[in-house]
Amino acid sequence: MVTTNKQIEEGYLKYMDEILKTEIGKDVNVNLVFIDKGEIERLNNQYRNINAPTDVLTFVYGDDDLYAEIFVCEDVIKENAEKFYNTFEKELLTVLIHAALHVAGYDHEYDTTNAKEMFQKQEEYLKKYDVDNN
């Protein structure tokens, strides 16, 4: 079950729950936390040694009883939406799908085979849940 500290369209949480259930096969507790640019830059530096803000960071805990925290920065998502000629809604959906796939165990930084599969799945879910055309 996905919970959040910010009021967002209910569909986003439903989509994340569906992806997690499909990919993992069971319910997962996920805390979706919206934070500012300074805080996400601090976390990115602390955990990835990258001294810059990012759109999303995902942390997964446990093996059998999975729990995850997903930190999202709206300001970076807005910037990326402009940069990639997306609506904010589509960019947010992209980030949340991406994070859900990380929770499900996909990794694009250290495993190139897994990265290809992850980005294919990300595109499939983007088409399925296309917020700009639903």
Swiss-Prot record:
Pfam families: YbeY. The keyword Ion transport does not apply. It comes from the Bacteria. Its cofactor is Zn(2+). GO terms for biological process: rRNA processing. Signal peptide: none annotated. It is found in: Cytoplasm. One of its GO terms (molecular function) is zinc ion binding. The keyword Nuclease applies. Binds 1 zinc ion. GO terms for cellular component: cytoplasm. Zn(2+) binds at residues 98, 102, 108. Keywords: Cytoplasm, Endonuclease, Hydrolase, Metal-binding, Nuclease, Ribosome biogenesis, rRNA processing, Zinc. InterPro entries: MetalPrtase_cat_dom_sf_prd (IPR023091), YbeY (IPR002036). Its EC number is 3.1.-.-. PANTHER family: ENDORIBONUCLEASE YBEY, CHLOROPLASTIC. Single strand-specific metallo-endoribonuclease involved in late-stage 70S ribosome quality control and in maturation of the 3' terminus of the 16S rRNA. Belongs to the endoribonuclease YbeY family. This is Endoribonuclease YbeY. It comes from Thermosipho africanus (strain TCF52B). The gene is ybeY.
